[in-house]
């Protein structure tokens, strides 16, 4: 039985033109793709806010093109640099840090918020948008991994709408349209398998960061590329599915599909399955969310099944890639474990990207963090942030490094 996380927009929302957008994470892969969609359909959208993190030069270029009234950066140093880079005579309001991002997510002039910041740093803004009744195009899966129950309650109270940008969850969302929620038997997420599909643990012992970043199908940022290589990305998506669709962890299956053509499937009680197919390009899902319930040309190459050739599927290798099962464990056990899982993973990925640990150390670090968790169960955003910070500090200390990352 599907119980979606939020209501859908009222019918008149379809005719809102232009849609007013706050793009949080505009300098990343998702944000850049979103602006390409906006560029292709300028009459449909008005960009009122753009937020990046450390890539101030790119944010300045975006701001010069779109001239939003609000910009967001990570810190005061970035804000000063941004002001110097903006065109003469253009003086938008600049918001700083997580609180600034959250303020941007609640701007009265922004009807739709694209939550595309990387990792736990996107939680505050997503939670704020949910409290204020926004239409949220959600790419930041960590928001639901960390605070799915809280965000569901906010949506129920405010009328906020969540539309999933993740290609897999967008596929599920589309496959559910027009069907009785009670007729759904299970959800099946597809995974590409990443750049190391078919490798043994012995093979993985010597892989480099550069190897892990070379995804065979998708153009993604560094953090999600590593998550794809470890299968943690799919683990987080399994947890996300439980919150988005109100299903149990055992009702969410995962199959490896190396071609990344079938984005996910829904199985119904009659034994049938409905799949969503398309070219592996995030603009399809982004355009679908930004214009829902309408459909526009996303600007991607058309899928030709004859040229695509064979579509194959296989079971994930949980021995070589244990992160998927670690995510399932964290969700089953609850008691703050998903927060610990995500924090430990973000630290481990950061250490790997800076060549301070090996690839196979990533799941080991996460497993140790889960084993050490004392059962603390956060009940609000402040509690989640406190557990996140404590976990990061512990993981860094055990790894022999200083804590330089966090939810900010």
UniProtKB/Swiss-Prot annotation:
- Native organism is Nitratidesulfovibrio vulgaris (strain ATCC 29579 / DSM 644 / CCUG 34227 / NCIMB 8303 / VKM B-1760 / Hildenborough) (Desulfovibrio vulgaris)
- GO MF annotations in UniProt: 1-deoxy-D-xylulose-5-phosphate reductoisomerase activity; manganese ion binding; NADPH binding
User: InterPro entries in the record, alphabetically?
Assistant: DXP_reductoisomerase (IPR003821), DXP_reductoisomerase_C (IPR013644), DXP_reductoisomerase_N (IPR013512), DXPR_C (IPR026877), DXPR_C_sf (IPR036169), NAD(P)-bd_dom_sf (IPR036291)
Q: What is this protein called?
A: 1-deoxy-D-xylulose 5-phosphate reductoisomerase
Q: What is its EC number?
A: 1.1.1.267
**Which reaction is catalysed here?**
2-C-methyl-D-erythritol 4-phosphate + NADP(+) = 1-deoxy-D-xylulose 5-phosphate + NADPH + H(+)
Q: Which residues are involved in binding 1-deoxy-D-xylulose 5-phosphate?
A: 141, 167-168, 192, 215, 228, 233-234, 237
Gene Ontology biological process terms, A to Z: isopentenyl diphosphate biosynthetic process, methylerythritol 4-phosphate pathway involved in terpenoid biosynthetic process
């Amino acid at each position: 039985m599907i119980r979606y996380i939020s209501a859908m927009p009222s019918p008149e929302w379809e005719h809102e033109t232009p849609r007013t957008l706050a793009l949080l994470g505009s300098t990343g892969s998702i944000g850049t793709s979103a602006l390409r969609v906006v560029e292709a359909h300028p009459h449909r959208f008005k960009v009122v806010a753009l937020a990046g993190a450390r890539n101030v030069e790119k944010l300045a270029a975006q701001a010069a093109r779109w001239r939003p009234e609000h910009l967001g950066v990570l810190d005061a140093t970035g804000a000063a640099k941004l002001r110097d880079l903006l065109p003469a005579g253009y003086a938008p309001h600049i918001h700083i840090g997580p609180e600034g991002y959250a303020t941007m997510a609640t701007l009265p002039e922004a009807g739709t918020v694209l939550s595309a910041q990387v990792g736990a740093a996107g939680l505050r803004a997503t939670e704020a948008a949910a409290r204020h009744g926004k239409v949220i195009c959600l790419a930041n899966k960590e928001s639901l991994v960390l605070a799915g129950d809280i965000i569901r309650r906010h949506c129920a109270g405010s009328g906020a709408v969540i539309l999933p940008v993740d290609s897999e969850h967008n596929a599920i969302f589309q496959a559910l349209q027009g069907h009785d929620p009670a007729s759904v038997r299970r959800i099946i997420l597809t995974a590409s398998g990443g750049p190391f599909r078919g490798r043994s643990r012995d093979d993985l012992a010597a892989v480099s960061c550069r190897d892990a970043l070379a995804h065979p199908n998708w153009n993604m940022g560094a953090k999600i590329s590593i998550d794809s290589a470890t299968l943690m990305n799919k683990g987080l998506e399994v947890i996300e599915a439980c919150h988005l669709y109100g299903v149990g962890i055992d009702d969410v299956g995962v199959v490896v599909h190396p071609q990344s053509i079938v984005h996910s499937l829904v199985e119904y009680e009659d034994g049938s399955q409905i799949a969503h197919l398309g070219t592996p390009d995030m603009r399809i899902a982004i355009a679908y969310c930004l214009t829902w319930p309408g459909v526009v040309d996303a600007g991607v190459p058309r899928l030709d099944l004859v040229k695509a050739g064979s579509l194959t599927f296989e079971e994930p290798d949980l021995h070589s890639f244990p992160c998927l099962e670690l995510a399932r464990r964290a969700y089953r056990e609850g008691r703050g474990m998903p927060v610990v899982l995500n924090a430990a993973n973000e630290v481990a990925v950061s250490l790997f990207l800076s060549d301070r640990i090996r690839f196979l150390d990533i799941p080991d670090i996460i497993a140790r963090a889960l084993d050490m968790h004392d059962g603390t169960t956060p009940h609000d955003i402040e509690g989640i942030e406190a557990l996140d910070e404590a976990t990061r500090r512990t993981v860094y200390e055990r790894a022999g490094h200083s804590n330089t990352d966090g939810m900010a």
